A protein has these predicted regions:
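ATP-binding N-terminal substructure of ATP-dependent carboxylate-amine bond-forming enzymes
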Residues: 1-110, 133
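Active-site nucleotide/adenylate-binding loops and adjacent lid/helix of ATP-dependent enzymes
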Residues: 12, 107-154
Length: 154
């Protein structure tokens, strides 16, 4: 007798193209997929068994949807997310990647700091600026050409 060892109900927090690929793979394994995003008809919602439209930055909305849907596993796939809720929820529901990893990857500064300062991985020169004058100052230190990116985007 073959048993299904995969989670029965997977919740995707973020339903973009990457979420759609995860949903397709999960459904092939016999999982029930709940696709969540801030807008209706996101790519993964088109093939999911169930979908929820919500503001995933809102702690209460996110908790309510998770509580009502009762997933076996939660997969965060979006940067704009109430990570503190994941920290609380992962005590009861499996979250992959976990809340700490999700928090680190949400912001480029956390990723850079982890790689450069904690893991001692060589990186390109980098700095953070909150306004134009700070940017000008850091640009002179780092040198040109340089690449400017927002710390967080989704």
């Amino acid at each position: 007798m073959i048993m299904n060892v995969f989670p029965k109900k997977i919740m995707l927090l973020g339903s973009g193209e990457l979420g759609k690929e995860v949903a397709i793979a999960a459904k092939r394994l016999g999982c029930y997929v709940i696709a969540c995003d801030r807008y209706n008809n996101a790519p993964a919602m088109q093939i999911a068994d169930q979908f929820e439209v919500l503001n995933m930055n809102n702690d209460n909305e996110l908790k309510e949807v998770i509580f009502n849907c009762k997933p076996d596993i939660i997969i965060p796939e979006i940067e704009a997310l109430a990570v503190d809720v994941l920290k609380e929820i992962e005590k009861k529901v499996r979250v992959i990647p976990n809340a700490r990893a999700t928090a680190i990857t949400m912001n480029r500064d956390k990723i850079r700091d982890l790689a450069s300062n904690e893991l001692n991985i060589r990186t390109a020169k980098f700095s953070y600026a909150m306004n134009q004058s700070e940017l000008d100052l850091h640009a002179e230190k780092i040198g040109y050409p340089l690449l400017i990116k927002p710390v967080m985007s989704s």
